[in-house]
Amino acid sequence: MNNRFLDACWGKPVDRTPVWLMRQAGRYLPEYMAVRSKCTFLELCKTPELAAEVTIQPIDILNVDAAILFSDILTPVEPMGLKLDFVPGPVFEHPVRTMADVEKLRIPNPEEDVPYVLDTIKILRRELAGRVPLIGFGGAPFTLACYMVEGKGSKDWANIKRMMYAAPDVYAALMDKVTMMDMEYLNAQIKAGAQAIQIFDTWGGVLSPTDYEKYVLPYTTKLINGLNRQNTPVIHFVKGAGTMLETVQKAGGDVMGLDWHVNLGKARDVLGQNMAVQGNLDPTVLYAPKEVIEAEVKRVLDENAGRPGHIFNLGHGILPTVPPENAIHMVECVHRLSQK
């Protein structure tokens, strides 16, 4: 088995830097689009055989060192009682705005309400047969709450911020419920066979460091502390968190995901030797000529300076129009340039 990814999560030495890409199963791959053309996005998420097929595609095509479950962070929110659609982005028909809305939300039972996610994990563990580890994932409580309150994507997330400041009791009740749901969901993924967990806090960086510490950190900390993670490393990725790495680190976890706005070496100095890091190439570099991609890969590796506990990744998801051959080249460069 290729254990490079798991070894790096635990800060152990590896023969070369492991690499995978956020959204590595996605629209930039013609093979993914061939499967996606037969069904809607939600149908793909809810059909275990198809979700497993697209999860494995980048392992075969890119030669990455880990697979990540194909799903969506909002998958477990729908059975809380919010109708979800994608048109093309996520839209909730009835956003959560009042205490009455929060009280209507239920805590789903993952085995009963999202069995397709757990079935996908079981199929993947069987089909991957130890080739690479399987990462499960979920949204962080704050990012999930952003979508639930806003009802859709937003540039300023004014509704969730208004709730935070003007109705803190409603915000706290919502975050408590979402955190409990998240804990049940991620523990069910671990039980089904996920070998690592990534928590995506895509919108945590829209808050000031003070507000993040007050309104987000307690819930993410509770979530991470509630995971059955004896042998399952947890990656915590907060996009836009470069100015508050020490605060984010207080949440716990084993690996800090970094976006491309921070120098990876300086981030490692701040975080200390006991926390592994993941990242952090700007996703748009994959539009560059191959020699530029190689130079940028080398720069990120040089910033890490050979320290153990580095997983190479993009600073956010791969973009849908990236040429697949550029992603293949990036992975090859990481492996070749980091070979011990």
Swiss-Prot record:
Gene that produces this protein = hemE
The answer to whether keyword Lyase applies is yes
Q: Which GO terms describe its molecular function?
A: uroporphyrinogen decarboxylase activity
- HAMAP family tied to this protein: URO_D
The family database entries (CDD domains) matched by this protein are listed as: URO-D (cd00717)
UniProt-listed Pfam families: URO-D (PF01208)
Identify the metabolic or biological route this protein is part of: Porphyrin-containing compound metabolism; protoporphyrin-IX biosynthesis; coproporphyrinogen-III from 5-aminolevulinate: step 4/4
Q: What does this protein do?
A: Catalyzes the decarboxylation of four acetate groups of uroporphyrinogen-III to yield coproporphyrinogen-III.
Q: Does the keyword Translocase apply?
A: no
**Protein source organism:** Geobacter sulfurreducens (strain ATCC 51573 / DSM 12127 / PCA)
Q: What is its EC number?
A: 4.1.1.37
Superkingdom, natural source: Bacteria
The major lineage groups are: Bacteria, Pseudomonadati, Thermodesulfobacteriota, Desulfuromonadia, Geobacterales
User: A biological process (GO) annotation for this entry?
Assistant: heme biosynthetic process
Q: How does it assemble?
A: Homodimer.
Q: Which GO terms describe its cellular component?
A: cytosol
Report what the protein is called.
Uroporphyrinogen decarboxylase
Instruction: List the InterPro entries hit by this protein, alphabetically.
Output: UROD/MetE-like_sf, Uroporphyrinogen_deCO2ase_HemE, Uroporphyrinogen_deCOase
Chief location bin: cytoplasm
Q: Where in the cell is it found?
A: Cytoplasm
